Amino acid sequence: MEPWRPSPRNPMDRIDPNTFRFHFPNLLYASGRKLCYLCFQVETEDYFSCDDSDRGVFRNKVHPWARCHAEQCFLSWFRDQYPYRDEYYNVTWFLSWSPCPTCAEEVVEFLEEYRNLTLSIFTSRLYYFWDPNYQEGLCKLWDAGVQLDIMSCDDFKHCWDNFVDHKGMRFQRRNLLKDYDFLAAELQEILR
């Protein structure tokens, strides 16, 4: 494999509660949050239920010599784990940031490879939502059949229950939905 290409790695099982609370709130401007987390679940045709799905968490790699966005980490991992392109897959992502234009393009190409895969993306925040290039990337995903939405309270609770190492702590929605209404309206406007 070329050294500049993302290499597959194993996803994390869960993330720390403080990491979740810091990186996932619906915020317009999230200073200091340079990492992107991607929580995923993969359901195959035989197991279209959450109980039997493959799930985990990817985080972007920020090393200058081996940069890899969380979406790229997932795509590389998925191709290794699920080489059969004619099977049916239902994939759900919960992202702390929406995809950049490059990742959006790579996801569209990935969906052309896996024609029987449905992808739903629930994102906490919109990355550079005012930039036309980022808007175009989201539109390309939408046009490719990707379900796109801003994470709701139910989505946050699902992530807490399935992707956070909460050690029995109860889910608290405090501050997670701060700018939900604005972000949801902005996404709808972009996709119109």
Swiss-Prot record:
SUPFAM superfamilies: Cytidine deaminase-like. GO terms for cellular component: cytoplasm; nucleus; P-body. Its EC number is 3.5.4.38. Its cofactor is Zn(2+). GO terms for biological process: cytidine to uridine editing; defense response to virus; DNA cytosine deamination; negative regulation of single stranded viral RNA replication via double stranded DNA intermediate. It catalyses: a 2'-deoxycytidine in single-stranded DNA + H2O + H(+) = a 2'-deoxyuridine in single-stranded DNA + NH4(+). One of its GO terms (molecular function) is RNA binding. InterPro entries: APOBEC/CMP_deaminase_Zn-bd, APOBEC_Cyt_Deaminase, CMP_dCMP_dom, Cytidine_deaminase-like. The active site is at E71. It is an enzyme of class 3 (hydrolase). Keywords: Antiviral defense, Cytoplasm, Hydrolase, Metal-binding, Nucleus, Zinc. Zn(2+) binds at H69, C100, C103. Residues 15-141 form the CMP/dCMP-type deaminase domain. The keyword GTP-binding does not apply. It comes from the Eukaryota. Its main location: nucleus. DNA deaminase (cytidine deaminase) which acts as an inhibitor of retrovirus replication and retrotransposon mobility via deaminase-dependent and -independent mechanisms. Selectively targets single-stranded DNA and does not deaminate double-stranded DNA or single- or double-stranded RNA. Does not reduce infectivity of foamy feline virus, feline immunodeficiency virus or feline leukemia virus. Belongs to the cytidine and deoxycytidylate deaminase family. One of 3 related APOBEC3C genes in cat, APOBEC3Ca, APOBEC3Cb and APOBEC3Cc, which are likely to have been generated after two consecutive gene duplications. (Microbial infection) Interacts with feline foamy virus protein Bet. This interaction does not induce APOBEC3Ca degradation but prevents its dimerization and incorporation into the virion. This is DNA dC->dU-editing enzyme APOBEC-3Ca. The gene is APOBEC3CA.
